[in-house]
Amino acid sequence: QKRFKPVKHNPVIIKEFGKTRVVYVPTMVELWIQHVIVMILEPIIAGSSYPMSFSSFPGRGSLKGQRAIRRWIESGKGIRNFAQADIRHFYSHIQYKIVRKKLERRVKDSFFLHLIDVCMTYFPKEMPLGFYLSQWLANFMLQELDYDIKCKLKIAHHVRYMDNYTLADDNKKKLHQALLYIRQALGKMRLRMKNDWQVFRFEYTKKNGKKTGRCVSAMGWLFYRSKVLIRKHILLHVERIARKLHKKEENGQRFPLGLCRGFVSLLGWITHSETYDWYLIHIKELVNVRKIKRIISKMTREVNRHAGMEKGTLQRAA
């Protein structure tokens, strides 16, 4: 039965890391339907996706992308020059009709396509941020271009982190040609590449001992030949949360579970980079990490116990 009709959503404005994002919050029914759709789409999209495309795929976060670029650098092959480019306002400029045509080549079930159409009823010219389905369709839209860059253009290394492209090759001319190809391919999909694209020499040391070139900034990491650091805004975010926790401890206040979990999660960036010295100076004196982990464990047990008691009460009442 084709009875489901979505509601019209009011946008929510979120400011994060100096960026303003327009987010749409789906209803519970919409979220349930989108999860069902993704359960069917996941083997189709993830199974045929470019292996070096990261973000929004399970098991393909920034850490896996970081490890990929580290391997390039450690191999020493095809890393003389790097090119980087972003898609301008990616989600807000994706036209659903273009994604639909690509889907029709892979999905032949008309009812399933109709279900996706219904979810996107009020978003013909954008992919709504906040919809679980959006990130999958956005990645699917760029799959063909990913393979073209690697197979047709023969670029040595290529990583895409959602709408950010990072390419590496010894031949600078090939990188310029690749950026031109990406710009033209995006134009056919009614998308635009930002004007801040760049092609540059990767940092290295000359015979006279002088360092030249630049590090690569991608996925929140700063890549050098001998180390990987974290971008400044992430370090400031970690320190800001550490100061909040320190202030609550000084005032004898209870630590919020969400804040503690967020802090421990962000420490993963430090674990997988060469920023331990920064941690000793800026974080260790403010927060006892072991204590925070014990608090998380204790509070999680309390939450689970209360949830179990409520479930038991409901079962007895039934």
Regions found by a protein language model. Give the residues of each.
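Short acidic (Asp/Glu) and glycine-rich catalytic loops that position anionic groups and cofactors
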Residues: K15-E16, A46-S49, N81, Y161, ...
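Conserved polymerase palm-domain catalytic core
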Residues: R67-M162, T166-R183, D196, F200-R201, ...
